[in-house]
C-alpha cells in the first residue's frame, strides 16, 4: 500500500512539473491571453476592440506614405508633420499604436489562361523567390479610468467616434491609403498577431510558452526587443526622421529605423510604435518640479539636466509641441531551430551606429508581447516601459516606408522592384487608376552597353502581348529575334529592295492640312536637305504647288472663275504700274494686254493634267507650274535649277526612282509587329531622313486606321529628322499621337545628341511625359546639362545615381536597372528576365547563331527552338549565355543534355 502511495505522489509531482514547464506557474500568466479582450463589436462597419480593462480601440489599415528608396527627404518630414497632427487631433487620453509588420514570403504567381509563352516563362522564373512584404496597421485607443467598476460614458464614446473619423480623413487628405478594419478583419488581425502568422491564408492557434528570453508558439520562437531601456535611455540628443546611406558616392536618405525590415533569419517582424497622449498641464508641472529639484543641488550633472529641461520647455512654449510617453519594441519571429543571437547582433550593431542602444534587459518577454496586442497598449508598465519625449522625436522613431506594389492598371508592364520581385507599372502613366501623365510619349537615354535595347525589347514584348500594335525603326538588328518570335514583318532596306511608298497617293477625304504639311516637309527635305534653311516664300510656294496639284487631279482645271480672273487682273495691273519698264499705251491697250496674259496663264494651266498620283506626276507638274506661279506673283530668288536637280533623283530613271513611286505593301497596316531595319542607309544624308519620314507617315496612317493601342519606337534613326526643317512635323506627330491612343518613343545613346540639339528639347523632350534613363555613370561629370534639359529634380538625380549600385544582387541573375519618370512620379526598376526572354532579345552573334542551329536542326518554330535551347542551357549548369552558345556552336548540333556539363 505504501508503495502505491509513493508511486502516486511521484506521478503527481511529475505532472505538476510538466504543467509548470509547459504552461507556466499559473496565476495571472496562466490566463494572460484570456484577460485581454472583452469583445469585438461592429459599429457602422468599424470593428471596435473592447478590452477587459475598459479601453476601446479602432484599427485602420494604412500604407506608409514614403516610398522606399524614394530619395525624398521632404517626404520623411511630411510624415512627422502628419503624425504630429494626428496626435494633436486626438489629444489627452488617447494612444496611437502603429504596427509595421514585415513578412518573409516566396513570390508566387497564378498562371493565367492562355498566357503567352514568354510571360509564362517570366513568372515561372521568379516563382519561389524570397522577398519581404510589409503591412501597416494603426490602432487608436481611448484610455479608461482605472477603477474596479466600469461605467458607460456616452460623451467619451461620441468623442472617440468623432476622433477616429477625423484621423481617417486627415490620413486620406494627406494621400495615405487608409481603411477601417471591420469586425471580422479586426478579429483576424488579433489572431494573426497572437499566432505571429501574417503569411498563410488560414491561421491555427497553438500553445504559448514564455521564458526570460523568448516567447514560443508552435514551430516558431519570438524575442521582443525593447528599443529604449528606461533606466538608461541611450538616445542621441538630436534625431531626424531619416538617415543617409552612401551609394555610388551619393547620399541616399532611408528611414531612420530601416534596419527593422531586413533582420537576418527573421520570418516575421512586428515593429510596435506606441505614443501615449497625457495631460500636458500635468506633465509640464512635473517637468518644472523636476527642473527645480535638479537646480536645488548645484553640480555639473544637475546643471546639464536643468539646461536640457529648459530647452524642452522653450520648444514647447515656442512651437506648441506635445509631450508624449512612448514605447517602441520589435517582436522578431524565427523558426524554432534558429539561433536568435544573429538577430540580436544585427539590431545592436545597426542601432548602435545611429547612437541608439537597445535594451539588454527584456526579461518581461511575455508581458511585452501581450501589451503589444492591438488595443492593449495601456497595460504597459508606466514606470519601466514608457519614456517621456516630444511628439516630433517620437514620430522620428516610427517606420515610414512602404515597399513597391503593383499598380492598378489595365496595361501592365512588369519590372522588378529593388529587392528583385516582379511589380507591374503603367508605363504610359495615363491608363492606370492614378493618372500621372498627359501623354504617353517617351524618351530613353542610355550609353552603349547599358542595356537599353534589352530594356526596350522587354517593354515592347509586353505591350504587344497586351494588344498593342508595334512599329519600330532600328539601325542595329536589335529587334530581329523578337520580331521573328512574334511572326512579325521585318523589313530591311537594300538597294535591290528599298523601303518604298507612294505618299502622294491619297483619296479626296485624306486631303487635309496635316497631309499637305507632311508632303511639303517631304519635298523640302529632298530639295534642301536636313540642315538646309527654308525661306517663308519657299515654304509657301511648295504648299501652293501641292494644293494646285491635288486640285488638278480631283477637280481638273477648266479655266479661271470670274472672281479668279478679277483677282488676277487686279494683281497684274498693280504689278504693271509698279514696273520700271515704261510703256506708251492707252488704258484700253493695257487692259487688252493684261487679258492676253491671263489667257496665256489659263492656257498653260489647262495643259497641265494629272492622270495619276505619284512622285513622278508631282515632279512633272511642279517643274512646269513653279515658274508660272513665280511669274504670276512676281516672285524672285527661287533656285529652280537646284530644285529640278535634287528632285530628279527620285524621278523616273533616277537612282531612287522606286522610293516614292511604288506603293507600300498594304498588308503592313494589318501587321501588329513591324520592324524597319535601315542600318544600311544610316550614313546617307538624304535617304536616311527621307525613309525615316516615310515610316513615320506609315505609322500616322496606321494610327488613324487601327482602333487599338499603337506605339512607334525610333532608335538612333531619330537623329535623321532632328533638324529645324522637321521640327514642326515632329511636334505635330507627337501631339497627334495622344489623340489616337498612340505613343511615340525615341531611344538614343549619345549624350551629345541631347545636349547639342534644340530640336530634341523643343520637339521631342517637351512632348514626352515619360523619361527612361539607364546607367548614367559615364555621364556623371556632365550630368548637370542633362538634368537641366530633362527637367530632373535633385531627388530624381539621387535615384539615378543608385542605378545598378545598390547591394541587391544576392540570389539574383544578372540584371540592369532603369530610372523611369512618369510626369512627376519617378522610380528605379530592375530589368531581369529568364533565359527564354534573353534568347529572344539577344543581339550577340554567337548566341543568335546557336539558336538558329537549334531551329534548323529541329525544324521547328522559333518558340520551340527557344524552349529546347533553354532546357539544355539550364541543364548544362553554365551560368552565362555566351559560353553556352560557344559550346553549342563548337558541337554544331543540338546537345539534348540530360546531365550537367562538367568540362
Q: Where are each of the predicted segments found?
A:
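Extended, folded cores of ATP/NTP-driven motor/assembly subunits in large transport
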Residues: 2-400
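P-loop NTPase motor domains
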Residues: 76-89, 261, 356-357, 367-423, ...
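Hydrophobic anchor at the beta1->P-loop junction of P-loop NTPases
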Residues: 444
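The conserved Walker
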Residues: 448
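Conserved lysine of the Walker
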Residues: 452
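Hydrophobic positions on the alpha1 helix immediately C-terminal to the Walker A/P-loop
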Residues: 455
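Post-Walker A helix-loop "phosphate-sensing" segment adjacent to the P-loop in P-loop NTPases
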Residues: 461-471, 486
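Conserved ATP-driven motor cores of ASCE-family P-loop NTPases powering translocation/secretion/packaging/pilus
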Residues: 496-534, 725, 729-827
